[in-house]
Amino acid sequence: RRWDRREARRARTAFTYEQLVALENKFKTTRYLSVCERLNLALSLSLTETQVKIWFQNRRTKWKKQNPGLDVIS
């Protein structure tokens, strides 16, 4: 789809170092968050639930690329 200049694009989220450390630490313990975990993490980091959800989606994709085959349930 061609980008329409009349549409406003959402600004890219710039996470702070502290937010990234907290997100990475949580990712080390679990790659999938429950709704409650996502809400609590978002509130504690002053982020929206959507920002946390998308960060985890992107991080899982990165993890799967770095660890091919490990995400398959055997």
UniProtKB/Swiss-Prot annotation:
Species assigned in the record: Apis mellifera
Keyword DNA-binding: yes
GO MF, one annotated term: DNA-binding transcription factor activity, RNA polymerase II-specific
Record keyword Plastid present: no
GO biological process: cell differentiation
Pfam family, one: Homeodomain
Compartment annotation: Nucleus
SMART domains for the chain: HOX
Annotation: DNA-binding region: 8-67
GO CC entries: nucleus
Alphabetical UniProt keywords: Developmental protein, DNA-binding, Homeobox, Nucleus
Protein name: Homeobox protein H40
Domain of life the protein comes from: Eukaryota
Major localisation: nucleus
